[in-house]
């Protein structure tokens, strides 16, 4: 795994990366892994053989199947990394809490706290410790989650969180600058796309067409206005950068194979690479046969 030799140079290296222009990935990971079945799985119960039909795997950074046999089978492995929030069960939570840069608890996810991306210590931790940790474990690259949060916080309280959106973009650029050869997938964070779409290989549209309603505890189609809005944002990104692979993660009940087929058909017609899962992401849901 190729990395920049300057990784250990500390904040000076990071600041230089933040001020630099985009560093496009050295390898076309989208071409290598895109257009093929892929999966998101945040557990460790499934045997290696269960992943046989998939090329790209997004796995939890700590709870996951053995990585070496998956890599030996040619799988592209992305490790989950929440960079807009810190969960209380993560090993680095106590350190970040001591720094005083944790904000409110996410009302939808108990024990997960928004983090102030404007603090250079957070960027340093992600780039110099967390990403290398994933690569040492055997992941090829990273799946960046919760980058919607800094955008949301700045929109909701522009004075208090001024600069959070740009800080999120700078974090993505810093990862790419320090790791030019690894695959990077970003989850949603659509307003960041014009700033970072040349620094990532995959953009994930989560809950674009189908979602889970936690109040009714049921799966449902996304309202048409929201679906069309997301569709436009993703297609616009594809037009600006054709090399960018757009993946979709929709949620539906495995007890309704016809519904799952409908989602796959819809997203492929959109030009995206779909996967349909249960909301817990703790089991592999194979695409139903035609």
What is each of the regions a protein language model found here?
Residues 1-2, 14:
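Disordered, low-complexity tails and leader-like regions
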Residues 26-290:
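Glycan-processing catalytic domains of CAZymes
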């Amino acid at each position: 795994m190729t990395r920049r030799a300057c990784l250990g140079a500390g904040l000076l290296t990071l600041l230089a990366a933040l001020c630099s222009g985009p560093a496009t990935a050295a390898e076309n990971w989208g071409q290598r892994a895109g257009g093929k079945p892929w999966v998101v799985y945040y557990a460790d119960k499934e045997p290696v053989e269960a992943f046989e039909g998939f090329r790209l795997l997004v796995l939890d950074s700590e709870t996951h199947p053995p990585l070496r046999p998956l890599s030996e089978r040619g799988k592209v492995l992305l490790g989950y990394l929440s960079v807009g929030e810190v969960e209380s069960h993560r090993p680095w939570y106590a350190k970040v809490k001591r720094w005083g840069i944790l904000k409110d608890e996410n009302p939808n996810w108990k024990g997960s706290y928004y983090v102030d991306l404007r603090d250079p210590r957070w960027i340093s931790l992600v780039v110099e410790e967390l990403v290398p940790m994933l690569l040492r474990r055997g992941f090829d690259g990273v799946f960046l989650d919760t980058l919607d949060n800094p955008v949301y916080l700045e929109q909701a309280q522009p004075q208090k969180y001024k600069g959070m959106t740009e800080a999120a973009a700078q974090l993505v650029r810093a990862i790419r600058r320090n790791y030019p050869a690894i695959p990077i997938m970003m989850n949603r964070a659509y307003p960041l796309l014009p700033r970072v779409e040349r620094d990532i290989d995959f953009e994930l549209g989560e809950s674009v067409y189908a979602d889970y309603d936690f109040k009714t505890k049921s799966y449902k189609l996304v309202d048409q206005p929201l679906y069309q809005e997301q569709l436009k944002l993703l297609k616009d990104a594809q037009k600006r950068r054709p090399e960018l692979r757009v993946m979709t993660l929709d949620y539906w009940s495995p007890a309704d194979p016809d519904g799952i087929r409908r989602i796959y058909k819809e997203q492929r017609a959109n030009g995206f690479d779909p996967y349909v899962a249960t909301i817990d992401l703790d089991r592999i849901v194979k695409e139903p046969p035609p």
